[in-house]
Amino acid sequence: MLRAVRLKFLFLFILTIIAIVFVLPSVTGELPGWWEKHVSRGLKLGLDLKGGMHLILQVDMESAIGNALNRDATDMKELAQKRGLAVKVGDVSKEALPVTLVNKDEQAAFQKFLKEEFPHLTAGEPQRQDGSLAFVLSLNPDEISQLRERTLSQSLEVLRNRIDQFGVTEPVLVRQGSDQIVVQLPGVQDPQRALDLIGQTAQLEFKLVDDQAQVNLPELIEQALKTGALKPGYAREQLNQALADKIPADDEIYIEKSVNRDTGRLESKPLLLKKKVLLTGAAIKNATVRIGDYNEPYVSVDFNSRGASEFGKITGENVKRRLAIILDGMVRSAPVIQERIGGGKAQITGSYTPAEAHDLAIVLRAGALPATVKIVQNITVGPTLGADSIKKGLTAGLLGTLLVIGFMIFYYRFSGLVADYAMILNVILLLGALSLLGATLTLPGIAGIILSIGMAVDSNVLIYERMREEFHAGKPLKAAIDGGYDKAFWTIIDSHVTTLITACALFLFGTGPIKGFAVTLSLGVILNLFTALFGTRVVYDWLLIKRWLKKLSFFEFFKQRNIDFVGWRHYAFVLSGALCLLGIVAFVQLSRGYGNLGVEFSGGALVEMTATKPFTVNAVRDILSREGWGHAEIQQIEGGKELMVKLKKSEASVGQISEHLADMLNKAMPDNQFKVIGKQEIGASISGDLRNKAIVAIIISMLGIIIYIAWRFEFIFGIGATIATFHDVLAVLGIFYLFHVEITLLVVTALLTLAGYSLTDTVVVFDRIRENLARKRGKLGEIINLSVNEVLSRTIITSSTVFLVVLALYFFGGVVLRDFALAMILGVLVGTYSSIFVASPIVYAWRKESKRVEVKREKVIELEAQKQRREEKKTTKPAPKKKSGKK
């Protein structure tokens, strides 16, 4: 026996050493290089802790389809002309290419032409128009599917090439869904420059300027503005549409931007270009930065052999004409061709800074994106904010640990020390497991670790309370300890499984940081089972063998309790009904987009700033109102030197908003300097997707809990547990809605965590009710009251340990985790109440009603049987009696 215990201790010791070895690089930076290379690199910090950018890019598949059809349109004009077919190719609109066959008698030849040259196009039913036929061509479904896949793959490759040349350490680029790319850039120093580099399509085109057309564009634009055909702030597409009947059919209008050498200002002017693209960026072999005559940088472009040949031909055939160089729909320069240019070189000039010219060279070398990309989510965390989050997370975790250690020693004496040992072992193994698995530690992940600290001792509380009962029942010390572990085993398993169900839902439907929380919580729960059931048992086995433990000495609350919880059910149902009604109203309103939704669910921009001196919210609000930003939501945090500004709807990017906001405040408060330390931008599509995923995660976790509880106990217990869980989630949601607390992704995470955790107390109560129903006789209400009174102290204690750590998280964990902690604080209180006053009384009411219905049904059956017997007596005539005569 002693040898077995020693081997178990050795096993625990080896596990602890391995965990420390893997987590050591995260604690100290004084390790040799080979340690990180061959042993462990420690915990990987998420972007929210070490700073950086997290982007979700939406690839515009419609533009990819439009680009493909535009290429087909250009090829069709040339190929049809070679075949002698008279066709008019229109402009691509809504993924459709209109083509008119001038001579309807050539229909068969045209259809053969399409089949041979453009098999990927589908032609609709032709429409007759005065001797001609009008076709609408579109890509067939297979081609669209392949194009989408090809576009996403090419976009991913182009972005990877750009970022690699930009020089970011350990970037992450992964596909998400069918049209999105997730980009993570840890430690990026210039976020706006990185955004410009990533978002630039870099579509390079060469087109001829139509100087021969007798068109006065400035005059036409002025007239269109006067008549209202064109609105101020027009886009190029709107300009071409408004002046379509004033310019040649094969021309289109572009805007040229150039620097005025005399004034140094950037000027814009319209240019009329030929639609035909003579050369594209696909022919580029290299692009480098050079310095021009005016000491200004420009980009020198080298073409490949085919591009050099084409460029020489183009310049040779168009001497004395202007050749426009177009980048992403903007004319960068339009020089006059003086002579044929050989050697395959060209220059792109403009008002570039050295950094801008360098980045343009990067995107040209990496190649153009096959379609435009839109940034639908942008979360940027400065290194200062990340370091502050780590500091506050560690402070909250340390304080929470000390509070739990002190409480357990106070209440359970020496056994509390054993539970504290298991908790510390749990944290060490958890950090080691995260390092071993290469998991990324995020700020929500730190919250998961802190939450695990409180939950780590819950299992020991259940074991100790069972030990107390066994010991008070007169059993020997060893039998009491064995009974404590044996009888608490399935209760512990049930409570942990329900938490794991919600953690799985969070992992499946959460975003990156929330997935980190789910992984941390799952590992914490699994390791808690190991440390509570194995780690502490080894200690008690050792103490019993050595005869060092003589008795169990525990503090005890609520001695000889006899509270009529079932009798109070009607009052509890009224209170709970009001809370649930409030929660349902909140859920409906929030689902419709009303209420204080965070930018994750409403869309918009969130900017976090720090100031050198304290300021007042009213002063900031007045400044923003004067500048037309009165709709912005303002929150002051952390001692009056930090500011959060939220704009739910804005056409500007979060980078532009943050720069403008900082300039605005610094000019209005010259004695106080504001600096942007973090920013978020969520597009409408992402916010809607996150909202839907949150709802699905809640539904999935609830269904999983119902199924498990119904399987482990019986159906009515599953119903009671589910109603109690819904009650807890709705109550917290309703309170948040009532007091206008912002509903963020972390709050939803807290609600889902609460859904699993609040069942811990409910499972404890249900397990005792089931046990007493099997071994005791009496009325149902009396047995339920007895069961709840017996487990009341452990219910309150398990809630208290978690309450202490989330309280520390609320006060010391920083503003980001504050609402998460508040939701958990409310959830612990409401969950304790519901396990006592809601879940058990529901089981009582259901069983009582079922029994009443059963009795009533039996009475009805008996009455029907009596009625049937009476009817039978009436319809059945008695046999006639024989008359007896005397002889």
Language model features by range: what are they?
Residues 11-19, 417-438, 449-456, 513, ...:
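Small-residue-enriched core segments of transmembrane alpha-helices in multipass membrane transport
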Residues 61-336, 688:
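Non-transmembrane, solvent-exposed regions of membrane trafficking/translocation machinery
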